[in-house]
A protein has these predicted regions:
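Short glycine/serine/threonine-rich phosphate/pyrophosphate-binding segments
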Residues: 173-176, 200-202
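ATP-dependent adenylate-handling ligase core
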Residues: 196-208
Length: 208
């Protein structure tokens, strides 16, 4: 009701290079990248706010990005946001694919960073020289890291001084405490045991 589809984007020129800028979901379907190629793009640079999901890295690199590169014959730099916003968490893991489908750069997940890439013009077009190849979090470490980043950024964005957790002695509250300490530091986490007459002694011991 509020927005209508605009025209397909055209490349921008930067230092003599025509760069296509498909934004986020523009690369999930072929039309935008194909149009950028047809209108003279030499390199694709795709800024993204792509939230974390299990196995999302494989889908981005080997699925969506690889398809657009194969279809257009253009290298693609995929730039993803890092951090949490409310219920969403963004894992970063930016990368560069060359026109032949090879991975030239893989940036780390969960860590905002700036990396200078080197490019050279070859007979078939531009190519990114090989560079950083960070190892991404394995599963299930990626899930834990997502919880830590999401909690950290939510608490800090809302300027909360810290968190208070009720401990039961069970594994669920123990995990919650571990996530909170890794996200905020022990000095910003206060754990409280709230026993009742039904609480077993072993639960009290585990909680303390």
């Amino acid at each position: 009701r509020l927005f209508a589809a605009g025209p397909l984007p055209t490349p921008i020129e930067f230092r003599g290079v025509r760069i296509g800028v498909p934004i986020c979901e523009d690369i999930w379907l072929p039309e935008v990248c194909a149009h950028l190629k047809a209108t003279g793009a030499e390199i694709l640079v795709s800024p993204n706010g792509s939230p974390y999901e299990i196995d999302k890295d494989d889908l981005r690199v080997g699925g969506v990005a690889a398809k657009r590169v194969a279809e257009t014959g253009l290298p693609l730099a995929y730039l993803n946001r890092v951090g949490g916003q409310d219920e969403l968490v963004f894992d970063g893991a930016s990368f560069v694919l060359n026109a032949d489908g090879t991975l030239a750069h893989q940036l780390p997940d969960w860590d905002a960073c700036v990396v200078a890439t080197q490019w050279e013009r070859r007979q078939g077009g531009w190519a990114c020289l090989p560079g950083a190849r960070a190892a991404l979090d394995p599963h299930p470490a990626d899930i834990y890291h997502a919880m830590v980043v999401g909690l950290r950024d939510y608490v800090n964005a809302n300027r909360f001084p810290g968190v208070v957790l009720g401990l039961s002695g069970g594994i669920d509250s123990a995990l919650s405490a571990a996530v909170a300490v890794d996200a905020l530091g022990a000095e910003r986490v206060r754990c409280v045991m709230l026993p009742s007459r039904y609480t077993a002694d072993i639960s009290l011991n585990d909680a303390t």
